[in-house]
């Protein structure tokens, strides 16, 4: 073993449904052995193993969890929309804001004008908040370019971020985020551009792991999203969707039936849609930050998701318009207080279920032999405190592929 971590209270989050009353899967007085960036040993402390080993890290009775995974972000963009926040609080309708040049297209304009270097440095700054909350993997979407050139630009920035030694990145193409001004009143033509030009180029250059869509009345229709999914699957890219956020169009059921790793938002999802997620083992990603920021009232169907055993992930949805909040622990708290998840469900939502939402469940999201050695060390007594307490610097360090990065 290259490195050994001792004297820790280990929250493995192993997906073992045979012990439903111990969902945290805690091992007291535990030890982790790491070889070549992967976990080789997990269990109770064995002094005969680590005695005399040259690289032993005494964790001082720290609480250790899998590294957190923020599985839905729009981290790369330029500009901000604080002025729209003020307008909304004064009662100005979003439609009026959009007519004034605001809304998502204001972010599109700013992002198109920014260089790759500018976008990179802005995104790296935003990552700091996620790092402080124990995040070791982040998903990053495009979607503020809406041209071939600018979508590629955003995804190249995500690839640069992935070279950081202390953060792993999963990249998602979200060209079907909004209708660009160049295609006003021509949504089918824009979908053709995505399917025939953007997706093939992204796949050829290996710039994305998934393709996402915004399936809504103010976004794209179910039929248009199906075209995008077909093109993505043809080019061997995973799929996921922004679905049932504002209405129930059936986008979640479509995405699940086509093999989506996750559907996200899902406030208006009905029981038939939930059953489809369960049938196809698709994760429901909850985004309480957007729910809170937009002062929504339609709650996601948590009881139905539990009833049908659909895994629930939690993410920040970090973006300039509806969730400018770079704190995954705040999302855990909101998921508990607003959506009535338990702290155990919240922790599962940012570890093993978040890994599944990105198709990474075989390598991340739990601490077990063979998994990547990504975990977080906390100065806490109980895993419930991760959802309970906010704003206190509880993180001691993050470990990425066995390398330690102190907070």
UniProtKB/Swiss-Prot annotation:
Details of cofactor binding: Binds 1 zinc or iron ion per subunit.
Pathway: Amino-acid degradation; L-histidine degradation into L-glutamate; N-formimidoyl-L-glutamate from L-histidine: step 3/3
Alphabetical GO biological process terms: L-histidine catabolic process to glutamate and formamide; L-histidine catabolic process to glutamate and formate
Molecular-function annotations in GO: imidazolonepropionase activity; iron ion binding; zinc ion binding
Binding site for Zn(2+): 72, 74, 242, 317
Record-linked SUPFAM superfamilies: Composite domain of metallo-dependent hydrolases, Metallo-dependent hydrolases
Principal EC category: hydrolase
InterPro entries: Amidohydro-rel (IPR006680), HutI (IPR005920), Metal-dep_hydrolase_composite (IPR011059), Metal_Hydrolase (IPR032466)
CDD domains attached to this UniProt entry: Imidazolone-5PH (cd01296)
GO cellular component: cytoplasm
Keywords linked to the UniProt accession: Cytoplasm, Histidine metabolism, Hydrolase, Iron, Metal-binding, Zinc
Residue positions binding Fe(3+): 72, 74, 242, 317
Catalysed reactions, semicolon-separated: 4-imidazolone-5-propanoate + H2O = N-formimidoyl-L-glutamate
Necessary cofactors: Zn(2+); Fe(3+)
Superkingdom of this protein's organism: Bacteria
Subcellular location(s) per record: Cytoplasm
One Pfam family linked to the record: Amidohydro_1
Function as written in the Swiss-Prot or TrEMBL entry: Catalyzes the hydrolytic cleavage of the carbon-nitrogen bond in imidazolone-5-propanoate to yield N-formimidoyl-L-glutamate. It is the third step in the universal histidine degradation pathway.
UniProt similarity note: Belongs to the metallo-dependent hydrolases superfamily. HutI family.
NCBIfam families: hutI (TIGR01224)
HAMAP family: HutI
Protein name: Imidazolonepropionase
């Amino acid at each position: 073993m290259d490195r050994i971590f001792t004297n820790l209270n280990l929250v493995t989050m192993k997906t073992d449904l045979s012990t439903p009353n111990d969902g945290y899967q805690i091992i007291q007085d535990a030890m982790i052995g790491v070889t070549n960036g992967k976990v080789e040993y997990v269990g109770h402390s064995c002094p005969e193993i680590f005695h005399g080993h040259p690289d032993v890290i005494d964790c001082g009775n720290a609480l250790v969890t899998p590294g957190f995974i923020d599985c839905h972000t729009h981290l790369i963009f330029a500009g901000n929309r604080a002025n729209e926040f003020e307008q909304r609080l004064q009662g100005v309708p979003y439609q009026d804001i959009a007519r004034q040049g605001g809304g998502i297209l204001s972010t599109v304009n700013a992002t198109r004008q920014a260089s790759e270097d500018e976008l990179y440095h802005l995104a790296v700054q935003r990552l700091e908040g996620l790092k402080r909350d124990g995040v070791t993997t982040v998903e990053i979407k495009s979607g503020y370019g809406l041209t071939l050139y600018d979508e590629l630009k955003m995804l190249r920035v995500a690839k640069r971020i992935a070279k950081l030694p202390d953060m792993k990145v999963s990249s998602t193409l979200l060209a079907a985020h909004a209708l660009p001004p160049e295609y006003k009143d021509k949504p089918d033509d824009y979908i053709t551009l995505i399917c025939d030009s953007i997706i093939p180029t992204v796949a050829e250059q290996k710039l994305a792991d998934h393709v996402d869509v915004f399936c809504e009345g103010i976004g794209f229709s179910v039929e248009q999203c199906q075209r995008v999914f077909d093109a993505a699957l043809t080019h061997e890219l995973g799929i996921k969707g922004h679905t049932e956020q504002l209405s129930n169009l059936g986008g979640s059921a479509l995405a699940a039936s086509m093999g989506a790793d996750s559907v996200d938002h899902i406030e208006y999802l009905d029981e038939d849609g939930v059953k489809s997620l369960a049938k196809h083992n698709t994760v429901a990603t909850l985004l309480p930050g957007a729910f809170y920021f937009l002062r929504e009232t339609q709650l996601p169907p948590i009881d139905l998701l539990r009833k049908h055993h659909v895994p629930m992930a939690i993410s920040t949805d970090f973006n300039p318009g509806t969730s400018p909040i770079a704190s995954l622990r705040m999302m855990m708290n909101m998921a508990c207080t607003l959506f009535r998840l338990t702290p155990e469900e919240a922790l599962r939502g940012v570890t093993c279920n978040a890994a599944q939402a990105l198709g990474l469940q075989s390598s991340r999201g739990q601490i077990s032999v063979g998994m990547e050695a990504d975990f977080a060390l906390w100065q806490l007594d109980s895993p419930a405190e991760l959802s309970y307490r906010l704003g206190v610097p509880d993180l001691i360090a993050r470990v990425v592929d066995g390398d330690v990065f102190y907070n």
